[in-house]
């Protein structure tokens, strides 16, 4: 999810704005056949969950999914009717960075953790 909101990512600007405007309870886990996915809450996820709760058949759910695609959200920018996959961390993303800056931030955060672990694992 973090890399969707980078300058280099080709995701539609509406998607980036949707993630930037997200809060800590903005995602929902949805079951699609035998696996779960996590999406940004929107009209699509609400309707999909309502259909599941009402006992919609796999065929009905598939037809719905075919009309509400990731392409619709990520490329066309329809962040309400398209499926917008993202992780639980979406609400923690609050800036548009370059991919290089994201990597630099990850490294800067992990180096002290590695150093602390290394000091605890040292053999006398």
Where are these regions (language model features)?
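Conserved active-site-proximal phosphate/metal-binding subdomains
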Residues: 2-124
């Amino acid at each position: 999810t973090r890399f969707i909101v980078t300058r280099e990512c080709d995701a539609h600007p509406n998607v980036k704005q949707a993630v930037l405007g997200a809060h800590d309870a903005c995602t929902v886990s949805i079951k699609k056949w035998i696996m779960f996915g996590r999406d940004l809450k929107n009209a699509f996820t609400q309707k999909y969950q309502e259909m599941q709760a009402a006992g919609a058949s796999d065929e009905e759910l598939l037809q719905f999914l075919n009309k509400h695609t990731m392409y619709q959200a990520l490329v066309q920018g329809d962040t309400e009717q398209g499926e917008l996959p993202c992780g639980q961390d979406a609400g923690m993303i609050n800036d548009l960075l370059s991919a290089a800056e994201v990597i630099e931030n990850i490294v800067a955060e992990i180096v002290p953790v590695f150093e602390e672990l290394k000091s605890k694992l040292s053999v006398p």
